[in-house]
């Protein structure tokens, strides 16, 4: 760069700094290198699929999928993980359907959870913004985008047309919210449903409510839906297998998948999840229905193997460490033992 251009640039930078404060513009090489701060999901398989060890703080995350697919269970499990690490969590219950007893069984400290049941979409999003601006909340869950009804629609007559109202509401709110979340390092999780476009013959007919803004502003989008047969003990169904696909990821390679097991009444089983990941990584060997770790036979069937590991937390941690070593580039957030 010649001298005249260099001086012009320096003058411009000084003027910007004077007007907007120190650090308003800086060279990328001068910025401190920061590791992505994350909140673990409660599933090692999903943490590895995300590539950063959990959901990113200071960003927007969308969890979407068909009904009863495990979306709210996953969001509540993330809240429980944040609380275990001393964080503060909020749940904006636009659907008015939060079950405190179920949340408690998932590990959520319900007495400390901030809950809001807003009357309108505007109120819900304003609450999210104010909580994020406080800088004191680690994760905010909104359940769900489809239930964020604009004030004009609530006050109008049944059958009135309100084309694009919700999409405009989301677009306006997310424009403001993105910068607020980044400054406060708060993770915002939006749970969303799926709808089918009418008249689509080719391609995927599914879409999500709320317009395109959430798809654009979300750093991570997770497609959560049931996969395969229910989990059975004997003839009794005790849970469901759920496939989570990382559809969008601005922080690591996307399109990775994780299969989770959600048990009725208790949610994710982190030890069974670790067994699945360890088998896939070759740390635990599976021969027929028997599971072995080195020379040690853990048991016949996954439930027996998981039970053996619960009784030996030091072995559980050893296996977890080996899985992470095999994973290589993934660094999980520091936290308590997954099996506790």
From Swiss-Prot:
GO terms for cellular component: cytosol. ATP binds at residues 65-72. Its main location: cytoplasm. One of its GO terms (molecular function) is single-stranded DNA binding. One of its GO terms (biological process) is DNA recombination. InterPro entries: AAA+_ATPase, DNA_recomb/repair_RecA, DNA_recomb/repair_RecA_CS, P-loop_NTPase, RecA-like_C, RecA-like_N, RecA_ATP-bd, RecA_C_sf. HAMAP family: RecA (MF_00268). Can catalyze the hydrolysis of ATP in the presence of single-stranded DNA, the ATP-dependent uptake of single-stranded DNA by duplex DNA, and the ATP-dependent hybridization of homologous single-stranded DNAs. It interacts with LexA causing its activation and leading to its autocatalytic cleavage. This is Protein RecA. It comes from Thermus thermophilus (strain ATCC BAA-163 / DSM 7039 / HB27). The lineage of its organism: Bacteria, Thermotogati, Deinococcota, Deinococci, Thermales.
């Amino acid at each position: 760069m010649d001298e005249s251009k260099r001086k012009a640039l320096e003058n411009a930078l000084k003027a910007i700094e004077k007007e907007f404060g120190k650090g308003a513009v800086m060279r990328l090489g001068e910025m401190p290198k920061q590791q992505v701060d994350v909140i673990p999901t409660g599933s090692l398989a999903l943490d590895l699929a995300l590539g950063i060890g959990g959901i990113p703080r200071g960003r927007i995350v969308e969890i979407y999928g068909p009904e009863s697919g495990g979306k709210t269970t996953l969001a509540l499990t993330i809240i429980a993980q944040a609380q275990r690490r001393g964080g503060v969590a909020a749940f904006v219950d636009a659907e008015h359907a939060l079950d405190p007893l179920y949340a408690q069984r998932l590990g959520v400290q319900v007495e400390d959870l901030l809950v809001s049941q807003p009357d309108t979409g505007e109120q819900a999003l304003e609450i999210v913004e104010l909580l994020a601006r406080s800088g004191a909340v680690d994760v905010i869950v909104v359940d769900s985008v489809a239930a964020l009804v604009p004030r004009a629609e609530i006050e109008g007559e049944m059958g009135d047309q309100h084309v694009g109202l919700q999409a405009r509401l989301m677009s306006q709110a997310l424009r403001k919210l993105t910068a607020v979340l980044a400054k406060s390092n708060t993770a915002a999780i939006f749970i969303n449903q799926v709808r089918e476009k009418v008249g689509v013959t080719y391609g995927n007919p599914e879409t999500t409510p709320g317009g395109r803004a959430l798809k654009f502003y979300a750093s991570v989008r997770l497609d959560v839906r049931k996969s395969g047969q229910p989990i059975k003990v004997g003839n009794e169904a005790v849970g469901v297998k759920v496939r989570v696909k990382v559809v969008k990821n601005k922080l690591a390679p996307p399109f990775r998948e994780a299969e989770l097991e959600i048990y009725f009444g208790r949610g994710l089983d982190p030890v069974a999840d670790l067994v699945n990941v360890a088998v896939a990584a070759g740390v635990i060997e599976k021969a027929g229905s028997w599971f072995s770790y080195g020379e040690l036979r853990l048991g016949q069937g996954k439930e027996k193997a998981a039970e053996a590991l619960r009784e030996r937390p030091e072995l559980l941690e050893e296996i977890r460490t080996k899985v992470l070593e095999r994973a290589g580039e993934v660094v999980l957030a520091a936290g308590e033992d997954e099996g506790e």
